[in-house]
Amino acid sequence: MENLCQRLNACQEKILDYYELDSNKLTDQIDYWKLVRYECAIFYKAREGNMQCINHQVVPSTVVCKQKAWQAIEIHIALQSLINTDYNTEAWTMRDTSYEMYMTEPKHCFKKEGTTVTVVFDCNKENTMDYIRWKYVYYKTDIGWCKGTGDVDAKGIYYTQGAYKQYYVDFKQEAEKYGTGVQWAVHVCGQVICCPEFVSSTCSSNQISTAKTAEPVSNATTQTTEAYVPVGTKETEAPYPGKRRRLSGPDTTVTTVTTVTTAATQPGQSVDYTNNNLHSTSGGHHPGRDTSSDQTVFIVHLKGDTNSLKCLRYRFKKHKGLYCNVSSTWHWTSNDTNQQGIVTITFNSITQRNNFLTTVKIPQSITSTLGIMSL
């Protein structure tokens, strides 16, 4: 018994030395785990001898001794194999080589430089969950240890294994666990990434990417075009046969043909914001302009990335009193495959529109254009 006490004292003294050293060398971490293995062996031997205490310490049960010994052996062997790689010169702290870190997702891998990823389920800020994205992941293969980089997209959190993505957090499964499994939004490093199902309601399938599709969200002032553009909309037949124009997007089910005519205000014309009518001081006739509309509203066109517009439009729900209506994401019909999406917001007055632009923060990546529209 005295022999076990002396050995345990010597072992634990050396363990405390490594705690105080706080080394970042891989060789020191290997020596530390070798001492932990030795400590577990002493406790196991003491339990076999029916010893309840040793050096005023309670001896763990046989099951606990075995479990801790297996953990120490697993980490010790993994570190011994890691020292034979090119990664042995990197900084390895006691935290990096702890068993808890080793068994954190992705399990049985060493990880460094974690970043918190917050996921909001079902558009409910009260229903959130935090996950960790690791910048570097060291994983074991048949040929030895390899180093991959971690990242996050709309599908989940992953690390690279060569040219492949190894997901260790699946947002779809997490959404089914914590919500309805339909909608989720990923917040990481100032970016917002929406799930594909949430985006697809207003985006065509060939414009959706499950990778990093969201633009950085910024509270800076939005670039605003101060040109007032009268826009007339007629839901009748197209003015030119064979050139029918429609709004693109899978959620657009308009059966009537919409012709949008944009015209800058000509010299001699002015916009009267009191009665919302367009006046001409020259008395001339302007073809293509319909001034017989019953109602004219003030609008803001938001133009930018389709996914960013989708996320931004969802945030508008918190400010319903600041606008009248908001459209779905639409595009001009053209041969340009890289065209940006457009969202149109209507207002009752200039004051309401100004209050909206002052209250709602628009990302810098989205351009806003002011104008009026006849309904």
Curated annotation (Swiss-Prot):
Job of this protein: Plays a role in the initiation of viral DNA replication. A dimer of E2 interacts with a dimer of E1 in order to improve specificity of E1 DNA binding activity. Once the complex recognizes and binds DNA at specific sites, the E2 dimer is removed from DNA. E2 also regulates viral transcription through binding to the E2RE response element (5'-ACCNNNNNNGGT-3') present in multiple copies in the regulatory regions of the viral genome. Activates or represses transcription depending on E2RE's position with regards to proximal promoter elements including the TATA-box.
Compartments (UniProt record): Host nucleus
Protein name: Regulatory protein E2
A GO biological process held by the record: DNA-templated transcription
Statement: the UniProt record of this protein carries the keyword Ubl conjugation: yes
Post-translational modification: Phosphorylated.
Subunit and partners: Binds DNA as homodimer. Interacts with protein E1; this interaction greatly increases E1 DNA-binding activity. Interacts with protein L1; this interaction enhances E2-dependent replication and transcription activation. Interacts with protein L2; this interaction inhibits E2 transcriptional activity but not DNA replication function E2. Interacts with protein E7; this interaction inhibits E7 oncogenic activity. Interacts with host TAF1; this interaction modulates E2-dependent transcriptional regulation. Interacts with host BRD4; this interaction mediates E2 transcriptional activation function.
Annotated region (Transactivation domain), positions in chain: 1-200
Gene Ontology cellular component terms for the protein in this record: host cell nucleus
Region: DNA-binding domain, residue numbers: 296-375
Family: Belongs to the papillomaviridae E2 protein family.
UniProt GO molecular function: DNA binding; DNA-binding transcription factor activity; nucleotide binding
Keyword Metal-binding: no
UniProt entry keywords in alphabetical sequence: Activator, DNA replication, DNA-binding, Early protein, Host nucleus, Isopeptide bond, Phosphoprotein, Repressor, Transcription, Transcription regulation, Ubl conjugation
Biased composition (Polar residues): 266-283
Gene: E2
Lineage: Viruses, Monodnaviria, Shotokuvirae, Cossaviricota, Papovaviricetes
Biological source species: Human papillomavirus type 26
